[in-house]
Amino acid sequence: MLQRIREVVSLANNPATDAVTKKQALDYLEQMKSDPNAIQIFCSMLTDSGSDDLCIFVSLQILCDLVAMNTSVDLLFVKNSIVEFLRGKINRNIKDAEFLRNKISELITRLFINMYGEVNGNQWNTFYKDLIALLSIDSLLTGPSEHFSPLGLDYFARICIQINSEVADQTFLRSKDEQTKNNNLKDTMRLEDVQTLVTIWFNCLKSLIIQQQNFELAVIILSCIGAFISWVDITLIVNPEYINIIYGYLDYSDTKIACSQCLCEIISKKMKPVDKLTLLSMLNLTDKVASIGEDDIDVYEKLAKLASSVGLELSIILEQCNEGVQSNETLEVANAADQQVLNQVAPLVLKFMSHEYDSVTEQCFPFISQYLAILKKLFAIGGKPGTAVAINSKRQPLDEAHQNFLVSLLNVCFEKMKIDDSSESNSEEAIEEFNDIVRSKLKVFQDSIAVINPNIYLENISNHIQVSLAGTDWTVLELAIFQMHNLCESIRNNLFGLNKTEISTSAATQLMHKFMALLLQNSNLFQMDNRYVQILFFELVVRHYTFLGSDTKDAVSLLNIFCSEFGMFNKSEKVILRTWYLFTRFVKISKPHLSVSVLSQLVSKVMPLLVIKTVTPSVDGSEDCDTTFDSQLYIFEGVGMLIGANADNTYDILDQVLTPLFTDLERCISLQSQSPSIVLQSHHILMAIGTLARGTHMGLVPENQVNNALVNEKLIHRTLIEKFSNIAEVVLVTFSYFNKHETIRDASRFTFARLIPILNGGIVTFASKLVVLFLESDLKTMEMNDFLGFLGQMVHTFHGDENFYDLFDNLLTPVINKLHILLDHLESESNESNWYGEQNGRENNGNDVSGARTSKTVVVTDSYRDKILLKKAYYGFLQSFVTNNVTSLLLSNRNRSILPTILGDLLSYNPQEIQETSTMKLALNVLVNFIKFFGSGGCTDVNDVHASSIGKLDGLNEYFITRTIPLAFEIPFKPQYKFNINDGSCRVIACDLSRVLKEMYIQSGGGQDVNSNPALKYLTEVYFPQIQLPSELGMELIQMLITQDTKAFEKYYVTLINRLTS
């Protein structure tokens, strides 16, 4: 048996073993746990001469798993086995690999958890006594000693740490029962054994200092002390003799880190403020830390953390003493803590904070954050009026000591905010990390100081910016711009606590105007070839352009800077792409009204960037092949906005941009080639033209009025309409030539959508040709979705235009027919996919669990999903007729023949479609509105200007009655629809179905006389008898339909479904 286990362990651990065999090996070991003799077998493995380290490790792991689920007899067997196993190791001084020592310690810890204390029936109450004797460390009970086993002490410390992890570590979530058990174990340890543990640790540390060796043992003992301190009596450890011994290990390079961590844990122990202050005063850690000389970075990190921890604890004392009602004692404690921070801790922490390594700096952040938070509560005179910090501040006068601290902290922030001089262009990740972790936190500290005392902040940061702006090194100038951004944000967020009316004339605002002017005049800056400086400059002036002043000259100066090698013509791709976007962003938010002469010069400068150069898509279809073009579109939009907003209302300059595009487009068409590169070039040109049109429109019309036809008609000049009519013609010619290509169809639709608000009613002529071209094209599903959305937008924009009405009257039937060709194709594909799925399901039945199909399984293929999306777009298109009061189009002479098809789409659903709640809700909403507006047979929409000219359709009311009423009863009750009224999505559908019934009743004449209302008559005389609904229930439903309003009937209908299906 043992040999078999060894073979299985070897197989499971062999990298060459195949996955199937490895799984079988692991399954075998898992099954062995269920063997009645598993405990005995794996205990035997520990001492079997044929077991290697791996077999022993696996055996120990399995025994760990078994300990928690076995009887006291088995536990005793495991205890005796592991004790003898470990005794042999100690007696022969066999120091196994660390992973084995940890696993042995884990097994002993598991035995402790299940055998120690009253909670475990006192099965092993002499645990620590036995362990100390077993590990040959009992000499440490009486004092320092040389006569103990270092290996035994190593095991003892590891076991202590693992026991603490199990019973006291708050990192892991435990059940209430587990937590109760752990608390009982800790209580027993406090009463019986903690004093012994503390004594052994103390004598061990004392012995190792005397011996000046085995410092690796000191490290693990210090870890023990740090782990246990949170829940043992602190006086056992915090006394002068014990602390002095711990302190001593700060003097040794091998133990500095562990000692620092241990001291951090000690001072973090929860206690009353006065007791904590006494502890910190006794420890006097800052003097000790300050006396330590140069060391490696890891040690510095821990020492910085230790100094910060002292400051953090003092800050907590200060906060606690300032809460609630203060006594003389609390005031004295608070003052003593504050003085200790200012005189001892702060200088040391600020020294660590200014260290060249950011990892050391970061250790200081918790203390600085906590202390500044307290200072805000005590001294803050800033902060946005009405915010918590402004309301809750005690506004005490800021004394000189605290002023000095704030100034010193600001100076450290200024120093540490500068990017490392050694940073090269390839260190982008390091700089981003620096910005995210260090700079962002330092900015928060600066902001806190601004809130505490705006004058200190403003005086120091303004001097800092002034000096930095005169620098020639890129890191200094970059920092100056960064700090200008911070100052702008301080003003924007009103950290200075000013009234709104005072902000624009405040000293801070005046300073920013001055700094912005200096920045634009800084010749060193614009000669600097550094992408961090360049991008940060443009980010600053765009985000905070209001500080540039209202003079158009500033805007022109900045636009010229954009159009230089410093900006949009930069050699760095990252700068180029970012500035192209920021250029347009700046134009959009500032909307400068430039004269045509100035504008012409700017456009001439930008023209090289408006040349479209395509990159042929790679064979693998990568989307990264032409990423530049998307950013290039921003320039077209920005140029369009400048032209649209020009001060002279002259738009001939548009030709300067459009003519090259038209020429290039003519070239593409004249080549008589439809190669991928030519098609892509044509697509890009169309997109550029559409984007230019959008920009021009945005420059002319206020952003919130771009879709207002009256405003557009008033503001858009006749010459512009002629130019954009010409654009529409160009788009149609291009579309006609390249209509087989989806990208061209997309670009054409995009451009036309941008022309609609500009040309208004003038677009109709062009739109009719565009729609015909689309209908003649081989559209894909997603294209049809977008096309229907485009048509819906046109319905919304031009529903009051007579020409539009005629256009849609002519095109509605062809559009629906085109739509049905696509729907039929998708239906065929979906059915075919389902057939293959069923065949595969039969073949896999019984062999593959994933082949099982329940009665509720919905097979979702790509074709099915496309069909659902297309129907959703279709219903949205139909809804646009309702929303814009043109449902009469559906009843016109031209479209009456297609109406049954449309209504059939709204009245026929398969079980899969019922599960698509959002689509069903939209469809039923359209159906309800159709019933509302022409359910009686004639168009009754009072807002539809063509309603009176549409004759009544005979039989339409009867059609609605005979088709909608069954729908309202079949969907909830027919088994194939799997309708569950308790499901939220089904309940939504039920509510919509109730509205269908209610609206059908109203449009059939309403009233209380069943015989005079065709809908009620059909229900009582035809449908209810047909479905064999009890007459009492039928009359109840009729009565509710007559007497209840829509909301009340909806509630009744849902309740009825519940009653009939429960």
Swiss-Prot record:
| One Pfam family it belongs to | Exportin-T
Q: Which UniProt keywords apply?
A: Cytoplasm, Nucleus, RNA-binding, Transport, tRNA processing, tRNA-binding
The UniProt similarity line reads:
Belongs to the exportin family.
Where is this gene product found?
Nucleus; Cytoplasm
For this UniProt entry, the molecular function terms from Gene Ontology, in alphabetical order, are: small GTPase binding; tRNA binding
GO BP annotations, alphabetical order: tRNA processing; tRNA re-export from nucleus
Instruction: Write down the InterPro entries for this protein, in alphabetical order.
Output: ARM-like, ARM-type_fold, Exportin-1/Importin-b-like, Exportin-T_C, XPOT
Name of protein: Exportin-T
Highest taxon listed in the record's lineage: Eukaryota
Q: What does the protein in this record do?
A: tRNA nucleus export receptor which facilitates tRNA translocation across the nuclear pore complex. Involved in pre-tRNA splicing, probably by affecting the interaction of pre-tRNA with splicing endonuclease.
Query: What PANTHER family does the entry give?
Result: EXPORTIN-T, EXPORTIN-T/LOS1
The terms describing its cellular component in GO are: cytoplasm; nuclear matrix; nuclear pore
